Amino acid sequence: MTTQFSVSGIELELLRYPSRQESNLQAWDAADEHLIKHLIDTEQTNINTAIINDNFGALTAGLLSIDPSWALTLETDAKTSLLGTTQNLSRNQLPTDTLTWVNSCDELPQGFELVLMKLPKNLNYFSHQLNRLSHVLPAGTRVLIGAKAKSINKSLLETIEKNLGAASASLTWKKTRVITCISDGKVRPLPKATTWSVPEFKLQITNLSNVFAANKLDIGARIMLDNMPKGDFKSIVDLGCGNGILGLHAKQVFPEAYIHFIDDSEMAVASARENWALNKLDNPALVGEQATFGWDDCLTHMSEGFRPDLILCNPPFHQGEAITDHIAWQMFLDAFRRLKNGGILHVVGNRHLAYHVKLQRIFKNCTTVASNGKFVILQAQKISKKALEPELEQESDLNSKLDANTEVPHPQSALYGKPKA
């Protein structure tokens, strides 16, 4: 894996997050290089700048290398992006006191004089981001968007003009181009969240713009809903929850359970929270918070005493533009560490991804629950702490520190910090 970022005299060491990913993926692409090169070539100086969709901090670190006092506002929907950017700034000994992080769902602050963006894979999300910018950018503000040349076409430029202002693309460099958009100062209405029904499960679903399966039930979730695990589960995690539909149905099937929704996407977590409220699934017989919502890199920051007895998982195999299985690996490893002894990991995935090999290696067991021509549902049970793989022993072994049957009292507000008073 290449870790040395070098462009126009700027030298950085950049890693993806988590840094244990496979070696053929790097923490930046040529579009990051092109944006930095463009700023240096045009002798851009320190002005109030927003950076949006900076995957692992290449743009942020680049600007701070030019001027450590550069005032930057960073917006990302991915927790791994936030953690990766923070990691790379520390690795390169760059300051963070001029940085402001903003929520992908809240209003943007005023006063930006320049915006740098990476084109996201999800164009509905991109349109939403442009709409948000139209609320805070005065006429004449430059927005520079880096993208692969093959992703830039007439339709994309028209989308930018419709949602923010006139746009034109640079010449190609390293198979990338920089789009320059000039804000026209007109405020666009923000798109409304998509709401749709799943009548066979009596659920209403709301999706924000960066959530997978925008207006319909995806095929993997469908087969999972039809094949929920059997048992008496009291603490259930919907890991990589998306809009939360698996956790919502789990509450229908196991009404005495407490459900915990976790995703790397802040918009996904917000959608799951909205859907919990929309479907009114609280059981009056239970006390405390019956659902918690965590914006997290898998189960990285869950409190150490948390021991669910069921984890539902529909792993993504993309991280941005990259196709990778490291997310599934991390989900399975985190599930093994966190599950109580006897706990179940219930997974759906494309057949060709061969998740059964990973689960067998980690859990020492794997059962096929259901399958069709494209998808398979697999189940693995944590039956012994001794099943820990040698490479896992190099990391923090929570199983050696805690009794795997330790229960955490409800409410579960302690999962992401101190309990509420």
UniProtKB/Swiss-Prot annotation:
Superkingdom of this protein's organism: Bacteria
EC nos: 2.1.1.174
InterPro entries the record matches: DNA_methylase_N6_adenine_CS, rRNA_m2G-MeTrfase_RlmG, RsmC/RlmG, SAM-dependent_MTases_sf, Small_mtfrase_dom
SUPFAM superfamilies: S-adenosyl-L-methionine-dependent methyltransferases
Reaction(s) the record says it catalyses: guanosine(1835) in 23S rRNA + S-adenosyl-L-methionine = N(2)-methylguanosine(1835) in 23S rRNA + S-adenosyl-L-homocysteine + H(+)
Keyword annotations of the record: Cytoplasm, Methyltransferase, rRNA processing, S-adenosyl-L-methionine, Transferase
GO molecular function, one term: nucleic acid binding
GO cellular component, one term: cytoplasm
Region (Disordered): 389-421
UniProt keyword rRNA processing, yes or no: yes
One protein family per Pfam: MTS
Gene3D superfamilies registered for this protein in UniProt: Vaccinia Virus protein VP39
Subcellular location: Cytoplasm
HAMAP family the record matches: 23SrRNA_methyltr_G (MF_01859)
Record function comment: Specifically methylates the guanine in position 1835 (m2G1835) of 23S rRNA.
Similarity comment text for this entry: Belongs to the methyltransferase superfamily. RlmG family.
Protein name, UniProt field: Ribosomal RNA large subunit methyltransferase G
